[in-house]
Amino acid sequence: MHQDYFEHDVIVVGGGHSGSEAAAAAANMGADTLLITMKLADIGQMSCNPAIGGIGKGHIAREIDALGGIMGKATDRAGIQFRMLNKSKGPAVWGPRAQCGRRAYARAIRQELEAIDNLKMRSDMVKEILTDDAGETVTGVRTNLGKEFRAPCVVLTTGTFSNGVIHVGEQNFGGGRIGESASHGITGCLHDLGFESGRLKTGTPPRVDGRSIDYSVMEKQPGDPDATAFSFLTDDLPSVEAQLSCWLTDTTPETHEVLRTGFDRSPMFTGALDADGPRYCPSIEDKIDRFSEKDHHQLFIEPEGRDTHEVYVNGFSSSLPEEVQFEALRTVPGMEEAHMHRPGYAIEYDFFPPYQIEYSLETKYVDGLFFAGQINGTTGYEEAAAQGIMAGINAVQKLRQADPIVLKRSEAYIGVLIDDLVAKGTDEPYRMFTSRAEHRILLRQDNADQRLTELGHKLGLASKERLDRTREKERAIDVTRETLSDTTVSPQQVDDYLQSVGTSTLNQPRPVIELCKRPEVDSEDLLRHAGLYDEVVTEAPGMLSAPRLIEIDLKYEGYIDRQKDMVEEMEEKERWPIPDDFDYHALDNISIEARQKLSKVEPDNLGQASRVPGVRASDISVLMVLLKNEGVEPMPKDRDLNLDAMGGDGQSFGVSRETAVEVG
């Protein structure tokens, strides 16, 4: 076989949400990329809930899209219901969520990947990471079929497959997902290279035949009439009439009694399964045990697609014996005749505590080796995909001999995610919430393109169409802001509306922009009532109208200014780099705990050091004095992308290959 078949720029191991984004990013940025996964038919598989987004997670999905990722486009094509969560609260914490067709989503991801010319795929299992003789630099991978593939950068995205064990009642067996084999060999190989691993668990609920459910006794949960897309490139979504509904029901005291009969055979209670699981997604038996005073728990009955009757019983994750799950389901209102396609199960798997990775997601022990996704201790498709796109970006940056891209906490939820993992670590599956982001007012889901698309385009990942749309949106906002400032309304035009929303009426004509600052006023309703909507509104690409975006900024103005001050203060610390060989153990004037934690995390700068648990403000002050004494200079305020190192021949690195996929 020709040697070129075995040699690549980047190898991505695993074709889940993380691996798909990593492979797409690296290939779209110009790297010759090989994606190796156990079954090509399972690329982009939704192992658990057939949905993308939610509170915090939806922000991440839109950030991935803004950078030029594929998750948003696949979600919009596969979506069967679209909703904006948290609308009763402020816009900063609104979270888009889409129910997807499970098979349709995987098909859309596969189509996105197959549209990239320099991305190759292989069905095989990687069992060994290859390095140089010193074990310090990655050189490639060896597969189950005995083939060696070489690359200077390897991205590991093993998900739940690394030494995965599935539990259903007293039964347990190897697997990475029900019906699929676990992968073996990588953990032992990484141990030999000096890495430490741990075990985590997650779970999934039973699947049920929707034809056996009585929906008439359940509460209908339709999609939004003004559906919000995930991709900034999407123009059209299904009407609310064309969307499929989800349904709400509840467990009963009888359900709980039936479930308790299986506790003595539950791996969670017998000790057969002692790995930590997701705190915010407990199993139904865990909820009953921990919240014994509650006589019911809400369940969401979610369709798995337009091409199947199968439904997902969200809220009923379980590893109890199959017969107990079946009998308990039949005590739930509307599910008295339920036919169970398959039981829920728990799965435990290997992960590698994230103190072993840099902020670029490159590992500290092996040069050129990157970890992304559940291998770093996260849970959730969006969290995995976010790490995947950043690992793919930074693998190419390494090939370019350019600086790694590290998003700040003030720039993106992706930055919050990675900073939390590296600085704080995790001993349980980590998931994103808006509450984790201290600068969340700046990080709205509607402005992800304004925050990240220009960066994605400079890197050669986001297409020119994306950048043009972002600039068009910004122009629309500027023009509309000027129009709202120049346009006045009289009391006769708007007093009825102002009274109806409970705010004071006008004594004289006032600029529209002034009224938009009032908490009670909806900018679009105000303009419609005044007869100015068609005259003023310039639709901005990216889902929300320009007046709505301006209104949000106006109402948050004071908070935004305060958060920008906080960001500036933190960025001053982040400008102070800490040398790679800095010896914290030699410092007698910081606490022992700080020395130990900082030596383990190895932060890149003072800002990162200040967020390491156990490090005090006084420790940071001492570090700053020491850095100054050693002649360390603060870095420039603006990120240096080292664009000269990115290639400029139009055929190699630096040319976006993001492709629009037409689906018939």
Swiss-Prot record:
Keywords linked to the UniProt accession: Cytoplasm, FAD, Flavoprotein, NAD, tRNA processing
Subcellular location: Cytoplasm
Any GO BP annotation: tRNA methylation
Main location: cytoplasm
UniProt-recorded Gene Ontology molecular function terms: flavin adenine dinucleotide binding
SMART domains on file: GIDA_assoc_3
Residue positions binding NAD(+): 277-291
Binding positions (FAD): 14-19, 126, 183, 374
InterPro entries: FAD/NAD-bd_sf, GIDA_C_N, MnmG, MnmG-rel, MnmG-rel_CS, MnmG_C, MnmG_C_subdom, MnmG_C_subdom_sf
GO CC list: cytosol
Keyword NAD set for record: yes
Cofactor(s) listed in the protein's UniProt record: FAD
Gene3D superfamilies: FAD/NAD(P)-binding domain, GidA associated domain, C-terminal subdomain, tRNA uridine 5-carboxymethylaminomethyl modification enzyme MnmG/GidA
Similarity comment: family membership: Belongs to the MnmG family.
Function: NAD-binding protein involved in the addition of a carboxymethylaminomethyl (cmnm) group at the wobble position (U34) of certain tRNAs, forming tRNA-cmnm(5)s(2)U34.
NCBIfam families, per the entry: mnmG_gidA
PANTHER family, A to Z: GLUCOSE INHIBITED DIVISION PROTEIN A, PROTEIN MTO1 HOMOLOG, MITOCHONDRIAL
Assembly behavior: Homodimer. Heterotetramer of two MnmE and two MnmG subunits.
Protein name as catalogued: tRNA uridine 5-carboxymethylaminomethyl modification enzyme MnmG
Organism: Salinibacter ruber (strain DSM 13855 / M31)
